[in-house]
From Swiss-Prot:
Gene3D superfamilies: Helix-loop-helix DNA-binding domain. SUPFAM superfamilies: HLH, helix-loop-helix DNA-binding domain (SSF47459). Residues 426-438 have a biased composition (Low complexity). Its main location: nucleus. Residues 518-529 have a biased composition (Basic residues). This is Transcription factor BIM1. Positive brassinosteroid-signaling protein. Transcription factor that bind specifically to the DNA sequence 5'-CANNTG-3'(E box). Can bind individually to the promoter as a homodimer or synergistically as a heterodimer with BZR2/BES1. Does not itself activate transcription but enhances BZR2/BES1-mediated target gene activation. Residues 1-91, 245-291, 425-450, 491-529 are annotated as: Disordered. Expressed constitutively in roots. Homodimer. Interacts with BZR2/BES1 through both C-terminal and bHLH domains. Also interacts with LHW. It is found in: Nucleus. Residues 255-265, 282-291, 499-517 have a biased composition (Basic and acidic residues).
Length: 529
């Protein structure tokens, strides 16, 4: 049965069947630009014979046409091969390499340097099968400036399986060599010897003509170029990622080794004392504990009825309670004064002295207390505005001329403890007699405390009386027939307590300055013996 035949591209008589089959046979292999002319000896009576004829000789025609097409495609782009003994200089001027043909391949091959992938080398599956069986192609690639020159080649069809194994082995060795060249671990001579040994062992290791292998070699070239500082960036395949991960793992391992070494050096016996916590039995810790124990022992001696067997927390609580008790006891005597301040810097110690000498009465005297003002805080002076201790003049109190300045009357020797926050102090006596016993003075002090008046420090009183007696004796006054009376006012301004020469000042309560406001009713104390 004869199939309907379409018109050929060019009408050539009465042979449409032969033209149709010849076009189909050529279209399966490679589209030829020049169609094959049909034989002229075929006539209309050979239609069945023409239909079966391509089935008999299509194999030979396909082989010849495909070999011719691949040969022309491979021979068009590359330049002519250099002579065999010619030496080439490696990129960067590192060394030279020589390409020499193998004896049993010189009549088939042409060396085609292929730095980049060219479009004519892309084949489909049928063409790759034909090339694996009937042709041997050479493919060479240049590595970067630091890598050597490596050739890949395919062997004959009889050594097909062995060639692919050698190709995989050689490719792995070359990949390792390229990676090592990138890291900088192998010298150039060793890489060259490695590549030459690989070529000597496997001849020319054949590279598979599949697209994946070509892309792998191209991506390795790009990786080496990027390691050398070029700006070209291409996508890397899975095997490159694996190699880069392996390199990063080796780099991280080297960093770990460095860190371990540094940690070992840092943990040397010399610096071990600084890093480790202080030992319980060290000499420094023992000294610190002994100091703490000594100070706790001092506290236990100060606090009455303290238990030696109590722990430190309970003992500190007992100390706090005792301090609070002392503060309450101190506040009991000074709550009537507004100048009481709880700040530790302004709290002044006070120590009463029982050996107190009384000032004799008979002389009205109001000195200027400059030294006392320097020793008493301002807050204490501010609250002493209304505190006035006045002594009325008696019959024995007679004025007498004294040409003595206030500074020469007394230079109070305040030794020992400074003047505290007690605001008024008076020491008076009616006659110059030996000081009474300490028991009577203690009783008198207790009475004054109950009345709200507190005596001044005996040290200051003794200095004042001594200076006054010396001044009176120098002026010719008989102290055995005279009585001395002393008035002291503590206020902000010292002008109200200034001394007037050649006259005896009236009581301060009568001649108080108008600018000093009286905060409360003044208390007067009359003392005498």
């Amino acid at each position: 049965m004869e199939l309907p035949q379409p018109r050929p591209f060019k009408t050539q008589g009465r042979k449409p069947t032969h033209d149709f089959l010849s076009l189909c046979s050529h279209s399966t292999v490679h589209p030829d630009p020049k169609p094959t002319p049909p034989p002229s000896s075929q006539g209309s009576h050979l239609k069945t014979h023409d239909f079966l004829q391509p089935l008999e000789c299509v194999g030979a025609k396909e082989d010849v046409s495909r070999i011719n097409s691949t040969t022309t495609a491979s021979e068009k782009p590359p330049p002519p091969a250099p002579p065999p003994p010619l030496q080439h200089v490696l990129p960067g001027g590192i060394g030279t390499y020589t390409i020499s043909p193998i004896p049993y391949f010189h009549h088939h091959h042409q060396r085609i340097p292929k730095p980049e992938l060219s479009p004519p080398m892309m084949f489909n599956a049928n063409e790759r099968n034909v090339l694996d069986e009937n042709s041997n192609s050479n493919c060479s690639s240049y590595a970067a400036a630091s890598s050597g020159f490596t050739l890949w080649d395919e062997s004959a069809s009889g050594k097909k399986g062995q060639t692919r194994k050698e190709n995989s082995v050689g490719e792995r060795v070359n990949m390792r060599a390229d990676v090592a060249a990138t890291v900088g671990q192998w010298p150039v001579a060793e890489r060259r010897s490695q590549s030459l040994t690989n070529n000597h062992m496997s001849g020319f290791s054949s590279l598979s003509s599949s697209q994946g292998s070509v892309l792998k070699s191209q991506s390795f070239m790009d990786m080496i170029r990027s390691a050398k500082g070029s700006s070209q960036e291409d996508d890397l395949d899975d095997e490159e990622d694996f190699i880069m991960k392996k390199e990063s793992s080796s780099t991280s391992q080297s960093h770990r080794v460095d860190l371990r070494v540094k940690a070992d050096v840092r943990g040397s016996p010399n610096d071990q004392k600084l890093n480790t916590p202080r030992s319980k039995h060290s000499a420094t810790e023992q000294r610190r504990r002994s100091k703490i124990n000594d100070r706790f022992q001092m506290l236990r001696q100060l606090i009455p009825n303290s238990d030696q067997k109590r722990d430190k927390a309970s003992f500190l609580l007992e100390v706090i309670e005792y301090i609070q008790f002392l503060q309450e006891k101190a506040d009991k005597y000074v709550t009537s004064y507004q100048g009481w301040n709880h700040e530790p810097a302004k709290l002044l110690n006070w120590q009463s002295n029982n050996n107190q000498q009384l000032v004799p009465e008979g002389v009205a005297f109001a000195p200027k207390l400059e030294e006392e003002k320097n020793n008493i805080p301002v807050s204490v002076l501010a609250t002493a505005q209304g505190v006035v201790i006045d002594h009325p003049t008696t019959a024995t109190t007679s004025p007498f001329p004294l040409s003595i300045q206030s500074n020469s009357f007394f230079s109070p020797v305040i030794a020992g403890n400074p003047v505290p926050q007690f605001h008024a102090r008076v020491a008076s006596s009616e006659a110059v007699e030996p000081s009474p016993s300490s028991r009577s003075q203690k009783e008198e002090e207790d009475e004054e405390v109950l009345e709200g008046n507190i005596r001044i420090s005996s040290v200051y009183s003794q200095g004042l009386v001594k200076t006054l007696r010396e001044a009176l004796e120098n002026s010719g006054v008989d102290l055995t027939k005279a009585s001395i009376s002393v008035e002291i006012e503590l206020a902000k301004q010292s002008s109200s307590s200034s001394f007037k020469d050649h006259e005896v000042r009236e009581p301060v309560s009568r001649t108080r300055n108008d600018n000093v406001k009286q905060t409360r009713k003044p208390k007067r104390l009359k003392t005498g013996q």
